[in-house]
Regions:
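Amphipathic alpha-helical scaffolding segments comprising HEAT/armadillo-like alpha-solenoid repeats
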Residues: 24-32, 55-75, 93-107, 125-136
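Amphipathic alpha-helical packing elements
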Residues: 2-31, 36, 335-339, 347-348
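Short inter-helical turns and helix N-cap capping residues of alpha-solenoid HEAT/ARM repeat scaffolds
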Residues: 38, 78-79, 107-111, 139-140
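Fe-S-dependent hydro-lyases/dehydratases of central metabolism
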Residues: 98, 102, 107, 115-357
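Well-ordered alpha-helical segments embedded in enzymatic catalytic cores
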Residues: 29, 44, 85-86, 220-223
Length: 357
């Protein structure tokens, strides 16, 4: 399994992208290896289980959560993963198959507090909310602390605020970029594989652009965008008109692949990033909001490719070389909360949870 996986890693690295997340079958094989680790591979196996299995309600997540639950509940012993570590890892899986075991672990004298810390940052509780409430009503101290944390919105306040000032490097795409430029229809089959699909972003030659596709019609300016990151700042997608055309979450995924940051413990997905345009199409604006990005409409005429620009989101100013080059107002101050929460969707679900608690 490891040999096959490493070959796959090498093939993907040649394309400049990370490996695919592990499948349910690979995850099951990985767990067998964890039970009886080959010498020298111990750390790698734990890393793979920690960072390369999808979260949520994926088939592989089910396999991972079942095993971690068995270890956390003391039904299985694992030399490489303690009960406490297994509980922590369950807490990184967002929702779905990890919730039941974490709620059960609130009763555990040794690791109940670890389960509580995990649930405090978990928003996708749905009906399991009532199970936590019942335990709290019966006097379970861990469940009470979870309810209190949700009521105090610690899932939100524990995250950093959007800073007063952001330094960005401009990746400027002249003219109108529609969602087919960002997520081409002929490449639709790769859309679920976000890093692979992102290679097709801007794959066709554009008039007046300061970049060339690496392979016209096949591969976009991947290395060019990477070279902009070498300046050490966030790279912002900047265009005259951005995101017109059909609604495609995949278009946002591709932009965020190059401009966002990794979602911790979730393979091959990113969030955040900055997108600037004279005009940003409404549906594209919304999908950016959902993903925790900062989309701002402002005059981008004085921003050129590779410029380093200071963005002051609360003041509504963009500054280059000490001079204000554009002023703006965000569409709603809620945008700043959405960015802090990691997206509009977590903000909505989190607020609901806090209101209930």
């Amino acid at each position: 399994m490891l040999d096959n996986y490493r070959q796959h890693v090498a093939e993907r690295a040649a394309l400049g992208i990370p490996p695919l997340p592990l499948t349910a079958k690979q995850t099951a094989e990985l767990i067998e290896l964890l039970k009886n680790p080959p010498a020298g591979e111990e750390q790698n196996l734990v890393e793979l289980l920690t960072h390369r299995v999808p979260a949520g309600v994926d088939d592989a997540a089910k396999v991972k959560a079942s095993y971690l639950a068995a270890v956390a509940l003391g039904k299985e012993a694992c030399a490489l993963i303690s009960r406490a570590k297994a509980t922590e890892l369950l807490g990184t899986m967002l929702g779905g198959y990890n919730i039941g075991p974490l709620v059960e672990l609130l009763d555990d004298a040794e690791i109940g507090t670890i389960a509580a810390d995990a649930l405090k940052k978990t928003l996708l509780m749905f009906d399991a909310f009532h199970d936590v409430k019942e335990k709290a009503d019966r006097g379970n101290a861990n469940a009470k602390s979870v309810m209190q944390s949700w009521a105090d919105a610690e899932w939100f306040t524990s995250r950093p605020e959007l800073p007063e000032s952001l330094t960005i490097t401009v990746f400027k795409v002249p003219g109108e970029t529609n969602t087919d430029d960002l997520s081409p229809a002929p490449d639709a089959t790769t859309r679920p594989d976000i890093p692979m699909h992102a290679l097709a972003m801007l794959k066709n030659k554009r008039d007046g652009a300061a970049f060339e596709p690496e392979e016209d019609g096949k591969r976009g300016p991947v290395k060019f965008i990477e070279s902009l990151k070498d300046k050490g700042h966030l790279v912002a997608y900047v265009g005259d008109v951005v995101g017109t055309g059909s609604s495609r979450k995949s278009a946002t995924n591709s932009v965020l692949w190059f401009t966002g940051e990794d979602i911790p413990f979730v393979p091959n997905k990113r969030f955040g990033g900055v997108c600037l345009g004279n005009k940003i199409a409404p549906i594209f604006y919304n999908t950016m909001e959902d993903a925790g990005a900062l989309p701002i409409e402002l005059d981008v005429s004085k921003m050129e490719m590779g410029d380093v620009v200071e963005l002051r989101p609360y003041e509504g100013k963009a500054i280059k070389n000490g001079e204000v080059i554009a002023e703006f107002e965000v569409k709603s101050d809620v945008l700043f909360d959405e960015v802090r929460a990691g997206g509009r969707i977590p903000l909505i679900i989190g607020r609901g949870l806090t209101a209930k608690a």
